[in-house]
Amino acid sequence: DVHSNDEIGYLAASLNYMANELNTLEEDQRKFVSNVSHDFRSPLTSIKGYVEAMLDGTIPVEMQDKYLNIILFETERLNKLTKSLLELNKFGSHGVMLDITSFDINHTIRMTVQTFEGTCMEKHISFNLILSGETLFVSADFSKIQQVLYNLIDNALKFSHANSAITIETTEKNEKVFVSVKDTGIGIPKDSIKKIWDRFYKTDLSRGKDKKGTGLGLSIVKEIIQAHGENINCISTEGVGTEFIFTLPLAKEQKEHA
């Protein structure tokens, strides 16, 4: 950087400003690529696992329809992620593009939970679903909320003990839907809770348990929820467990049927 009080100094300041703007743009692009890489890996791992299990006979022929439906669900996720990648140039320097529709959050939770069946069987972890009503429609970006659920459940599984349960609950209050993902795992140290939303951050407790993780999952979650104008909170006690609660707007048709 050049510093001076004359016109050359002013020109240098302008050039410095432009250089900083370019660096910001590059950082946003790097951030986007990091997000997409993280989100691609999850469904690909799921698809690979189920196909291998069908080929080696772990999944019997009579059960294959169920798992083929899960694979189809995951390929649809990949298709949506690919479209997001192709829309890279539409992203603002500080924004997430949202495609707002009405969809059933309860059904989305059930389908997302199914994709973790293999991991759950390995670790003997079960899901306890406490869903408000048979259907519960929200107004949000379907594929991005799917990413949020996937990342939160993946996180809960990673840090849960064997033979434990993860509770996912939906409740409706004041035209908002509250979604909670709660585990009874290792918990997060008090001094780390504020840092968990930072990119690439991992607590000392998680480093040994999450060798393959990028430290991006929760920062992606927060960015998506904030882009919707909603909130996400974390309640955690070390050695007891962690709960993530986020809000979404209730869909118009859900209000009319209330």
Regions found by a protein language model. Give the residues of each.
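Short alpha-helical segment of the dimerization/phosphotransfer core of two-component systems
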Residues: 73-78
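Conserved catalytic submotifs in the C-terminal HATPase_c
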Residues: 3, 99-104, 121, 126-136
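Short conserved segment of the HATPase_c
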Residues: 188-202
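Conserved micro-motifs of the catalytic ATP-binding
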Residues: 93-98, 137-140
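Amphipathic coiled-coil signaling helices used for dimeric signal transmission
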Residues: 3, 7-28
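Conserved glycine-rich
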Residues: 229-230
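Short helix-loop "hinge" at the ATP-lid/N-box region of the Bergerat-fold HATPase_c
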Residues: 156-157
